[in-house]
């Protein structure tokens, strides 16, 4: 029987920052948040912090976001390794073209034992889940049979790697959209804010909304000055959304 893969989001990389020693400036932050402030101050050479309201890093970054000077957010980035996400969800995810992606290849990785991601609305209903897993099992069985026959048909291909790749790329056509995939996603702070604003909305598909909420939680930990204006709230149906009055790029 098909196994259900739980969503897992792991932060694997984030920006480090080293201030130039010849610039007369310091800040109370580090990493990406410090880089954002440095980039903003570099535009105006305001190293002496003339405005008390923006003297702290948090105050400065909040002002940057409030006035819409979003370009300085593009200097800092975060990378996530995401597993337990369905192929159908990554088809939506990769529409965010300011991100960079590296995704599991079904041409090189066999899917005999692939897990599936149960859609919201099915995952908590035993009868629906049984129908779902039976369909997933049928798809995987068809994949395995096609793969075996295709490899036999391509036996004259002397290059074993090419033979396996050609068989897999044809057989994968019967795998369900719910098949689990794994993907590395890198984006700058501006791109992540846009993603959260678009996909943590109640109007987004629930699977990608869950992904956006989990990414947001880790982004707040990594750079609270940049992401803590988003508020996560629970709706009447028990699902979560995130909104911010400063999220104007949608």
UniProtKB/Swiss-Prot annotation:
Its cofactor is FAD. Its EC number is 2.1.1.148. It holds the Pfam family Thy1. The keyword NAD does not apply. One of its GO terms (molecular function) is thymidylate synthase (FAD) activity. Pathway: Pyrimidine metabolism; dTTP biosynthesis. It is an enzyme of class 2 (transferase). Keywords: FAD, Flavoprotein, Methyltransferase, NADP, Nucleotide biosynthesis, Transferase. Binds 4 FAD per tetramer. Each FAD binding site is formed by three monomers. The active site is at residue 199. It catalyses: dUMP + (6R)-5,10-methylene-5,6,7,8-tetrahydrofolate + NADPH + H(+) = dTMP + (6S)-5,6,7,8-tetrahydrofolate + NADP(+). One of its GO terms (biological process) is dTMP biosynthetic process. DUMP binds at residues 92-95, 103-107, 172, 199. The keyword Aminoacyl-tRNA synthetase does not apply. Residues 7-233 form the ThyX domain. Disulfide bonds: none annotated. A motif (ThyX motif) lies at residues 95-105. FAD binds at residues 71, 95-97, 103, 188-190, 194. CDD domains: ThyX. InterPro entries: Thymidylate_synthase_ThyX, Thymidylate_synthase_ThyX_sf. Homotetramer. Catalyzes the reductive methylation of 2'-deoxyuridine-5'-monophosphate (dUMP) to 2'-deoxythymidine-5'-monophosphate (dTMP) while utilizing 5,10-methylenetetrahydrofolate (mTHF) as the methyl donor, and NADPH and FADH(2) as the reductant. Belongs to the thymidylate synthase ThyX family. PANTHER family: FLAVIN-DEPENDENT THYMIDYLATE SYNTHASE. This is Flavin-dependent thymidylate synthase. It comes from Mycolicibacterium vanbaalenii (strain DSM 7251 / JCM 13017 / BCRC 16820 / KCTC 9966 / NRRL B-24157 / PYR-1) (Mycobacterium vanbaalenii).
